[in-house]
Amino acid sequence: MQHAAVPDSLVHEWAESIVGDQYPVPDRILHFTEILVQDYLSQEMCDNRPPRGAYDLFATEGGTAAMCYIFDSLQENFLLNKGDGIVLMVPAFTPYIEIPQLSRYQFRVTKIHANRMNNEGMHLWQYSDEDIDRLKSPKIKALFVTNPSNPPSYTLSPDTMARIVSIVRNDNPNLMIITDDVYGTFSPHFRSFMAEIPYNTLCG
């Protein structure tokens, strides 16, 4: 992808980024950097088939920090409240399991497990349709998923992805999906939920 830029403005932004002599106000990714990140996400998270429009981006100092900000922001903006029901797809990165249990959140956590097996008794690291269908309940406010999974490193099957997308579109349109796609770049032709249902998705 190609973008036009005023050379002096581009070099000025890069120089300020390297020197670190000021913070952007309001907090945000710098202009030209954001353009590059948008293209990168379209390529790596959307298989070069992004939805129309641009993503709202916010950079953090790391993945765990991002999770803390996400939980706090959802609660401070009354999108999630104490006692709300959330679904956690496991296995998952440990902070996803521990953070919702803190007294400041007290979410009602339902874990669904990637326990499907093949005919030889080997783990497929995939989820049953019955468990996925639990997301149809309006009592479930948010779904937390690591895709590809951590530590098994398996992506959600196309059937499971399609089933969740269908549930959001037809059964639970207010369901928020918080997806950690940090290992998506290792999966050829990977497509995140942010590519399929961007309005409902927060991707970290």
Language model segments and positions:
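Conserved core of the PLP fold type I
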Residues: 9-172, 184-203
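Residue-level marker for buried hydrophobic side chains located in beta-strands
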Residues: 177-178
